């Protein structure tokens, strides 16, 4: 189970802490979308303190 959690954390693109977390997951989602990612959420693994972006296209 711990291995799965670590793999999920490594595979997701992490934004900086904050951006609405904790408390405003919509702000986190807006932030992630504004930087070119598909979505964002407050990550439970970090006790909802970090905004995690998913589906990012990568830096060019």
From Swiss-Prot:
InterPro entries noted in UniProt: Defensin_invertebrate/fungal, Scorpion_toxin-like_sf
Gene3D superfamilies for the chain: Knottin, scorpion toxin-like
Cellular component terms (Gene Ontology): extracellular region; membrane; other organism cell membrane
SS bond partners: 21-42, 28-51, 32-53, 37-56
Signal peptide range: 1-17
Induction section of the entry: After a bacterial challenge, the level of transcripts decreases dramatically in the circulating hemocytes. This decrease can be correlated with an increase of transcripts in the gill and the mantle tissue, suggesting a possible migration of the hemocytes expressing Cg-defh2 towards the tissues implicated in the first defense barrier of the oyster.
Any one GO MF annotation of this record: lipid binding
Keyword Disulfide bond: yes
GO BP terms in the entry: defense response to bacterium; innate immune response
Region (Binds to membrane interface): 22-25, 43-49
Tissues expressing this chain: Expressed in hemocytes.
Keyword entries, A-Z: Antibiotic, Antimicrobial, Defensin, Disulfide bond, Immunity, Innate immunity, Lipid-binding, Membrane, Secreted, Signal, Target cell membrane, Target membrane
Keyword Disulfide bond: yes
UniProt binding sites for beta-D-GlcNAc-(1->4)-Mur2Ac(oyl-L-Ala-gamma-D-Glu-L-Lys-D-Ala-D-Ala)-di-trans,octa-cis-undecaprenyl diphosphate: 19-21, 31, 51
Location within or outside the cell: Secreted; Target cell membrane
Primary localization class, coarse: secreted
Domain of life according to the entry: Eukaryota
Family: Belongs to the invertebrate defensin family.
Domain-level remarks: Has the structural arrangement of an alpha-helix connected to a beta-sheet by disulfide bonds (CSalpha/beta).
Biological role: Antibacterial peptide mostly active against Gram-positive bacteria. It acts by selectively inhibiting peptidoglycan biosynthesis through complex formation with the cell wall precursor lipid II (1:1 molar ratio) thus inhibiting cell wall synthesis. It does not disrupt cell membranes. Is noticeably more potent than Cg-Defh1.
Name used for this protein in its record: Hemocyte defensin Cg-Defh2
Protein species of origin: Magallana gigas
């Amino acid at each position: 189970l711990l291995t799965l959690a670590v793999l999920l954390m490594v595979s997701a693109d992490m934004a900086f802490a904050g951006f609405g977390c904790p408390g405003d997951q919509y702000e986190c989602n807006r932030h992630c979308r504004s930087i070119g990612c598909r979505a964002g959420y407050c990550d439970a693994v970090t006790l909802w303190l970090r905004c995690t972006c998913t589906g990012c296209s990568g830096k060019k």
